[in-house]
UniProtKB/Swiss-Prot annotation:
Family membership: Belongs to the protein disulfide isomerase family.
Keywords: Disulfide bond, Endoplasmic reticulum, Isomerase, Redox-active center, Repeat, Signal
Compartments, as annotated in UniProt: Endoplasmic reticulum lumen
A GO MF label: protein-disulfide reductase activity
Name of this chain's protein: Protein disulfide-isomerase A5
Residues spanning the signal sequence: 1-21
EC number(s) given by UniProt: 5.3.4.1
Catalytic activity field: Catalyzes the rearrangement of -S-S- bonds in proteins
Gene transcribed to yield this protein: Pdia5
Species of origin: Mus musculus
Motif (Prevents secretion from ER): 514-517
Amino acid sequence: MARAWGLLLAIGVVLPTWLSSTKVSSLIERISDPKDLKKLLRTRNNVLVLYSESEVAAESHLKLLSTVAQAVKGQGTVCWVDCGDAESRKLCKKMKVDLSPKDKKIELFHYQDGAFHMQYDRAVTLKSIVAFLKDPKGPPLWEEDPGAKDVVHIDSEKDFRRLLKREEKPLLMMFYAPWCSMCKRIMPHFQKAATQVRGHIVLAGMNVYPSEFENIKEEYNVRGYPTICYFEKGRFLFPYENYGSTAEDIVEWLKNPLPPQPQVPETPWADEGGSVYHLTDEDFDQFVKEHSSVLVMFHAPWCGHCKKMKPEFESAAEVLHGDAESSGVLAAVDATVNEALAGRFHISAFPTLKYFKNGEQQAVPALRTKKKFIEWMQNPEAPPPPEPTWEEQQTSVLHLVGDNFRDTLKKKKHTLVMFYAPWCPHCKKVIPHFTATADAFKEDRKIACAAVDCVKDKNQDLCQQEAVKAYPTFHYYHYGKLVEKYESDRTELGFTSFIRTLREGDLKRLEKRREEL
C-alpha cells in the first residue's frame, strides 16, 4: 500500500512538472465552453484557435503560440481548446474538429469577423504564423515556398548589413513587395537560379515594402518592385534590370555581370514606313470620311501585344492596299500621342481595333492575324452576338457574390460551391457537369449548387477568405459553415453521388430520431 501511495505521489509530482515546463502565455485563452468561444468570436475579429487531441499533443504548439500571442498582441487573439478534455469535447464536435485520424493530433483554425475563415495550412513557424495573423488575406512568405530554400531571406536592416559585411561571394539581392505581380513572376526563376549557383554566388530576397526600410530604399534607389542589385564584397556595383528573365538568363548573366546597357530609342511605327496609314487627332475624321471601309488599330509603343500584332497588320495592309479592287484600308493610331482620339473612343487596353463603314463606327470581332484581317476587310459583317456567360444562362446554379454569399449559404443545409474563373479551361470543361447536377436537385430546397466568379472585383476578397488558390475549387458548406474541400470526380456522376450521400445521411439521422421517439 505504501509503495502504491509512493507511486501516486511520484505521478503527482511528474504531471505538474510537465505542465510547468510548458510555458503557456497568459495571452493564450483556454476555452472549453461553446458559449465562451461564440462570445469571443463575436467580439474579436482575428482569432487563431489551436484544437488539440490532448495537453501532451499541444505542448510544442503552445510554446510556439505563446511567443506568437505576444508578437500579435492587440492585432490578433490566440486560443486553445483541449478536445481530450471531457468538458471541451462538445465544443470540438460543434466546431466540426475531426482529430480521429491517428496521425492528426492538432488543428489550427482561423476565424475572421465572427466566421470561420480557413484551416491554417502554412508553415508552423513563428515568423509565418505572425505574418499570417498580421495579414490573414496576404500571400504566404516567400521563404515558405520549398523551392526557395536556397534563397537567403533577409528580415531586418541589421541582417542585411551583416550579410553585406560578412559575405565573400558575389551577391544578387532582390528588393521586393509581397503584392507585386512582377515580383511573383520572377521569384520562381530567381529561386531556381539560386539553386543552380549555390556555393558560388548568393541570391537573396528582402521585403522592403514596410515603411521601416525607407533608408534602404533611398540608398539603393528602390523606386519600384522588384529592384535587383548586384554586390561584390559588400559593395554595390550595378542593378540587374532584366525583369522578364528566366533562371537560365540570370545564371548566364552571373557568369559575366555587366551594368545595364543604354537603350537605343525605338523608332516610332509611323516613321518606319510601310503600308499602314498613321492617323492623328487632326486628320482622323477626314480620313474615315474619305475611305468607305477603315480598320483602325489603337496601339501604344510599349505594348508587347501590339508589337506582336504589328507585323501581321502591316502584311495585311500590304495585300489590301496593293489590290486595286479593295476598298478597305488599315490605319493605326498611337494612343499615347493622340490622347483626344483615345479618350473619344474609350481606349483602355491595347491593341484595340475599331472599324468604320462610310464614316460610321461598327462592331468588329477579335482579329489578330494577317489572314483574319484580310478576310474581314473583304467581307466585313457584324460579328455574331457573344454567347451568354454562364451567369446569364437560365440554370439552377446560384451565382453568388461577396455581398450575398454568407446569407444565401446559411439558408441551405447542403451547398456545393464552385469557385471559378471564366477564362479557365478546366472550369469550362466542368461547367456542364456542375450545371446538370444543380438541375438534378433543383426541387430540393435544402440543397444548392452555387458558383462564384473569382475574377470579379467584388468577389476577390471572398475568394481569398475561402483560400481559393486554383480554379476550379469546390467547397461543401453546411448551413453556411465550410465543412470540407470537395476533391472527388469533377463529373455529373461525381457531384450527384456526393450530394446523394449527404441526403442519405440526413434520412438515416431522421430515422434514428424517430426510433428513439
